Amino acid sequence: MTPVRAAFTEAFGPHCFYCGMHLPAGNPVDHVLPWSLVGIDGLANLVLACAKCNGDKSCALPAIEIVDRVLERDQAVLEEIARAIQWPTQRDRVVAAARGIFRGQPPDVPTWGGYRQTIRFDVAFEPEWMRATYGRAVAMTSITIAWT
C-alpha cells in the first residue's frame, strides 16, 4: 500500500479521510468497504486513515454517508493516480459491492460513522449509487413468451 499512501498524501493531503486529523508518515491506508466483506483493493475503496479511526472501524460496515463521500471523490484524480502508480481504481466494483451490501441490510443495522460513533442504517432517501442505473445507460428490451 506504500504507493497508494504516497500518491493519496500528495493528491488529497496528509489527513485522515474520516476525522481530518493530520497524519504522520506511515499512516494506515483503509478499505472503506472492509476487505473481509468485499476483497477490493481498488483506489475507489481506499482512503488515508489515522491509526485511531482505522483501528476503531476495523471490519465494520461504514455508514452510508462515508460511502457517499468516498464515491464523490474526483474520479479524474483517482484515474490519474491509477495511471501513475499502475493500480486499478475498480470504481464500478466498489459501487456494485456497496449496492449489494447495503441492499441486503435490515433496517437499523449499526454502521460505523466515525471514531466511537454508530449510525443506524436507514435508507429513507436512497443514495444515487444504490440505484441499478447509476453510472450507465440502461437498454430497454421486451420479451414475448409464447406458450405452446
Residue ranges, per PLM feature:
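Generic hydrophobic alpha-helical scaffold/packing signal
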Residues: R5, V47, A51-N54
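Histidine-centered nuclease catalytic patch
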Residues: Y18-L48, K57-R73
